From Swiss-Prot:
It comes from Burkholderia multivorans (strain ATCC 17616 / 249). Disulfide bonds: none annotated. InterPro entries: ATP_synth_asu-like_sf, ATP_synth_asu_C, ATP_synth_asu_C_sf, ATP_synth_F1_a_nt-bd_dom, ATP_synth_F1_asu, ATPase_a/bsu_AS, ATPase_F1/V1/A1_a/bsu_N, ATPase_F1/V1/A1_a/bsu_N_sf. Keywords: ATP synthesis, ATP-binding, Cell inner membrane, Cell membrane, CF(1), Hydrogen ion transport, Ion transport, Membrane, Nucleotide-binding, Translocase, Transport. This is ATP synthase subunit alpha. The lineage of its organism: Bacteria, Pseudomonadati, Pseudomonadota, Betaproteobacteria, Burkholderiales. One of its GO terms (molecular function) is ADP binding. Produces ATP from ADP in the presence of a proton gradient across the membrane. The alpha chain is a regulatory subunit. SUPFAM superfamilies: C-terminal domain of alpha and beta subunits of F1 ATP synthase, N-terminal domain of alpha and beta subunits of F1 ATP synthase, P-loop containing nucleoside triphosphate hydrolases. ATP binds at G169, D170, R171, Q172, T173, G174, K175, T176. It is a peripheral membrane protein. Belongs to the ATPase alpha/beta chains family.
Amino acid sequence: MQLNPSEISELIKSRIQGLEASADVRNQGTVISVTDGIVRIHGLSDVMQGEMLEFPGNTFGLALNLERDSVGAVILGEYEHISEGDVVKTTGRILEVPVGPELIGRVVDALGNPIDGKGPVNAKLTDAIEKIAPGVIWRKSVSQPVQTGIKSIDAMVPIGRGQRELIIGDRQTGKTAVALDAIINQKGKDLICIYVAIGQKASSIMNVVRKLEETGAMAYTIVVAASASDSAAMQYLAPYAGCTMGEYFRDRGQDALIIYDDLTKQAWAYRQISLLLRRPPGREAYPGDVFYLHSRLLERAARVSEEYVEKFTNGEVKGKSGSLTALPVIETQAGDVTAFVPTNVISITDGQIFLETDLFNAGIRPAINAGVSVSRVGGAAQTKVVKKLSGGIRTDLAQYRELAAFAQFASDLDEATRKQLERGRRVTELLKQPQYQPLQVWELAVSLFSANNGYLDDLDVKQVLPFEKGLREFLKTSHADLIKRIEDTKDLSKDDEGALRAAIESFKKSGAY
């Protein structure tokens, strides 16, 4: 059979008309430029915001800018081998990280890859890093405490499970120290901790991990690290990855605590990415959605109801509420809390712990300014005994700070004012605390009880801390039953109050401090 040329051309035409275009063509694009980890891609007509893109060499990126004729994406990891003309494919997937108990005790990067040299993580599940926060209907009010073991926080700015409490202050004021003490104090308290290090020196992160290992805290802690040497994309994603790991426990009726150290550096990383993507800059050159950057992260910290947990686990876990407590850290410049990012995060969170350089340099550590530090919801979660005893402390300190300012100009003070100043000096001294030495509830209760009932008033200021330490040792050896009752009931009954008074008086008489 012979075909003439016209028949051949007709055959080809009919084949072309009947050809179904492959979907792959729509899902492939070409790299048109690579600069500072930002890639412009032409030809990706079927791509979602936040979708993972596959580059040559098993490298992945994240689609962030969807424009009319191109897509702006950020590369996750090394990008030296990517060049103009490379083929990019869509994956149809959103970025996910491994989750589950297998991560506990490990140090991972922002994508959940282990970086501690202890082998693979072997997590059975993965979950999306961007998730919608639980709705109002699924939330419960905060009612259980997170004991940080830090006297001034547990007494004056208590934190509850499911709360967001900001730690804010200049550099070198002890922000990380407060966060680490909170983690160390969770030993045996059935609370999983996640520490997210963003933009810190690798040596600083190593010191944190070493300290957590020394104190046995790595047994219930996950460390997510995006150091200063990592790309801006990794620093931007690390908090979301850590939050997803924490949500795994929250949604299964457990309690978790996450620390973001610090969100200022995440905002810087996001600003860098946005400017490279040519997004219009706003105040302080941040993009317009920098508030949403932090609000969508911190809204995921919540106390969820028993119904939510039961629904999420398909009835496997019943009668248990879960919580994710967030302690975001923000670094200020020269104490300026009116800057863009600090004001944003203050408005999102349920209170703030303000650390001051002047107090830190004066030797008052932790350097917490009691006047401007607040906890908007934690009061409901405070243990009974601490709530009963801490009211007077805050008042004493506030009055002391006010009077101390006037006392500088007054030559002769009346007896009541002088007494108030003396009490304030002793309370300030009492609230000093060495790092890595968090206190149990009974220890805090005894310290507050001593201050409230005037047992410190006749001591020299330098004797306050030795007296407190000696009293604790004395109670441990001679009144173990009293300690146990306070620790178990988290309350101070009339009988126990009388016993504690007698114990303190006998210790004072002994002078063993």
